[in-house]
């Protein structure tokens, strides 16, 4: 059974372990928790929770962003985030939604599921046209985006831009 849970400052060792499994940087997805101590992870949870409630742009670039975890039968298998609006830089790389599945849970359809659920959440906060970018060589993510209604609108030497209209 699938469940998408919003990040909580009370998230525990199961989420910490998931974030240790997800590489620090892979296919344009950055995971700042990989390599942190459990105490540092708990501090990260507080910061990420605050980002969700932020108003406007912070530090000249950080937009409000809500983080979620995909659970399968009670086990966290992936994470994703929704950026509430876009800066010019995020229009080039990043877009509204970023997501990643732990390497040990890939090729099971979980990427498609987390993106489907993140799209629903994005609609719930008022985002009607969703931009998602992916690396040119990230074929798995391209398939996931297309399966969720993504339309390729632009391609550069490094990235593909997709819009999902909800």
Specify the residue positions occupied by each region the protein language model found.
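Short aromatic/hydrophobic contact patches that present stacked aromatics
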Residues: 3, 98, 131-133
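Conserved GNAT acetyl-CoA-binding A-motif
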Residues: 122-133
């Amino acid at each position: 059974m699938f469940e998408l849970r919003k990040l909580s400052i009370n998230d525990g060792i199961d989420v910490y372990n998931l974030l240790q499994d997800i590489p620090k940087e892979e296919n344009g997805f950055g995971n700042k928790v990989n390599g942190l101590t459990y105490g540092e992870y708990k501090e990260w949870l507080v910061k990420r929770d605050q980002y969700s409630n932020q108003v406007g742009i912070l530090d000249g670039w950080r937009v409000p962003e809500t983080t979620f975890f995909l659970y399968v039968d009670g086990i966290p298998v992936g994470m994703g985030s929704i950026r509430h609006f876009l800066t010019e830089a995020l229009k080039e790389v990043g877009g509204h939604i970023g997501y990643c599945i732990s390497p040990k849970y890939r090729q099971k359809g979980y990427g498609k599921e987390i993106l489907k659920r993140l799209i629903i959440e994005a609609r719930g906060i008022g985002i009607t046209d969703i931009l998602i970018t992916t690396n040119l060589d990230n074929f798995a993510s391209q398939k996931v985006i297309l399966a969720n209604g993504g339309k390729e609108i632009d391609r550069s030497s490094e990235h593909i831009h997709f819009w999902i209209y909800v």
